[in-house]
Amino acid sequence: MGDIEKGKKIFVQKCSQCHTVEKGGKHKTGPNLHGIFGRKTGQAEGFSYTDANKNKGITWGEDTLMEYLENPKKYIPGTKMIFAGIKKKSERADLIAYLKDATSK
């Protein structure tokens, strides 16, 4: 399991421009991520997803996020997420630990 505090810093630096995590948070360029764990791709209510995201059909969890966050466009070809990915596995683990904590409160 990753480090939540390190993950929060990564989120602020690399994700917060497009995403929020708090319950009831607004969608930005990307969807609000609250409740992402256990949710299928393309299912955040009120956000307009590409068909690629809606049709991927996986459920978000630690393993799927680990793979997705390495290279989003490879994992879901056609996604509108323009983020290049996080190559370091330890940084992805930290970010996932933070997301698991922050999106469940």
Curated annotation (Swiss-Prot):
Keywords: Acetylation, Electron transport, Heme, Iron, Metal-binding, Mitochondrion, Respiratory chain, Transport. Heme c binds at residues 15, 18-19, 81. It holds the Pfam family Cytochrom_C. Signal peptide: none annotated. The modification N-acetylglycine is found at residue 2. InterPro entries: Cyt_c-like_dom, Cyt_c-like_dom_sf, Cyt_c_1A/1B. One of its GO terms (molecular function) is electron transfer activity. It is found in: Mitochondrion intermembrane space. One of its GO terms (cellular component) is mitochondrial intermembrane space. Its main location: mitochondrion. Binds 1 heme c group covalently per subunit. Transmembrane segments: none annotated. Belongs to the cytochrome c family. Electron carrier protein. The oxidized form of the cytochrome c heme group can accept an electron from the heme group of the cytochrome c1 subunit of cytochrome reductase. Cytochrome c then transfers this electron to the cytochrome oxidase complex, the final protein carrier in the mitochondrial electron-transport chain. This is Cytochrome c. It comes from Aptenodytes patagonicus (King penguin).
